């Protein structure tokens, strides 16, 4: 259940019912107007707080991605890595504050002046462009995170599932006025099934070893789940930038980014797992010629029991 506020039309209906009952005292009228004003202010505050929470969670996810990709020794030796700015994390946390202020002065102030019709409703294509830009802005961080530590097959399967489900969400957003919410969710779930079957077909028809197939299938499936969940959240944000259930949506997205954080932590072991598999597949003659460094690396790597999710 989302935290929803009454629309301007609903407020007008309530306002008219109150005054059609015969009580037209100036005191009652002033009280109702004051209550509606405070409700609208509370709505604006909750919207800005939800947007700020969403942006902060994004910044935390990006910072966590950098801390997972790059070793701790590198971060300590170069305090401003990778931007060569000592206060890079603190500066990055100012981005959500600036974003929330921009949205408030650009989109919320007109609502205060024109409550009957929001200006963003008159330009749906422009708002669609803004939605796509907001989605694409988070993909480079994910791509950099995966590219710095993942094999090409894992990166490709993960990014493809993400892009396909985001495209599905964009199609649903365009057709939001022509079908019900249940039909939109059914469309997204149908795309999930198709992409999952295609992914299984690709993974199990390649000449790979079974451990590698299971590894790629596991990560691509988790990526598919994350991308599908994210596309559902995009569906919730049908009213672009300022959804009426923005508090619930921001909380869901925050949980999603936390899940992505642990997913990246899980993916980081991929190289160690593959190296362990290669060592196990070596013939006995090659195993006898292993150097002490190889043996120490094999003993310090992640055990094969971590393959199971």
Swiss-Prot record:
Keyword flag Transmembrane: yes
Location of the protein in the cell: Host membrane; Host cytoplasm
Main localization, broad class: host cell
One GO CC term, this protein: host cell membrane
Record keywords, A-Z: Host cytoplasm, Host membrane, Membrane, Transmembrane, Transmembrane helix
Membrane-topology descriptor: Multi-pass membrane protein
Transmembrane segments: 50-70, 85-105, 128-148, 154-174, 185-205, 210-230, 245-265
Protein family (similarity comment): Belongs to the cytomegalovirus US12 family.
Name of this chain's protein: Protein US16
Species name: Human cytomegalovirus (strain Merlin) (HHV-5)
């Amino acid at each position: 259940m989302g935290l929803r506020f009454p629309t301007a039309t609903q407020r007008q209906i309530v306002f008219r019912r109150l005054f059609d009952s015969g009580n037209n005292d100036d005191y009652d009228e002033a009280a109702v107007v004051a209550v509606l004003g405070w409700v609208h202010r509370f709505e604006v505050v909750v919207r800005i707080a939800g947007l700020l929470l969403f942006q902060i969670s994004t910044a935390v996810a990006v910072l966590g991605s950098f801390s997972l990709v790059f070793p701790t020794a590198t971060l300590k030796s170069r305090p401003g890595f990778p931007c060569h700015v000592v206060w890079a994390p603190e500066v990055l946390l100012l981005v959500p504050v600036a974003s929330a202020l921009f949205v408030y002065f650009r989109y919320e102030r007109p609502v205060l002046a024109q409550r009957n019709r929001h200006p963003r409703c008159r330009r749906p294509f422009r708002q669609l462009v803004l939605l796509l830009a907001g989605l694409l802005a988070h993909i480079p961080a994910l791509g950099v995170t995966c590219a710095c530590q993942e094999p090409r097959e894992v990166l490709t399967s993960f990014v493809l599932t993400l892009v396909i489900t985001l495209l599905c969400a964009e199609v649903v957003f365009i057709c939001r006025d022509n079908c019900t919410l249940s039909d939109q969710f059914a469309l997204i779930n149908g795309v999930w099934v198709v992409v999952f079957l295609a992914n299984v077909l690709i993974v199990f028809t390649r000449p790979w070893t079974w451990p590698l197939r299971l590894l790629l299938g596991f990560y691509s499936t988790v990526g598919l789940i994350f991308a599908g969940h994210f596309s559902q959240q995009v569906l919730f944000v049908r009213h672009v930038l300022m959804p009426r259930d923005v508090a619930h949506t921001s909380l869901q997205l925050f949980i999603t980014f936390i899940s992505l954080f642990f997913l990246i932590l899980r993916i980081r072991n991929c190289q160690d797992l593959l190296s362990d598999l290669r060592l196990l597949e070596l013939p006995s003659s090659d195993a006898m010629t292993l150097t002490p460094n190889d043996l120490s690396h094999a003993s310090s790597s992640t055990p094969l029991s971590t393959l199971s999710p």
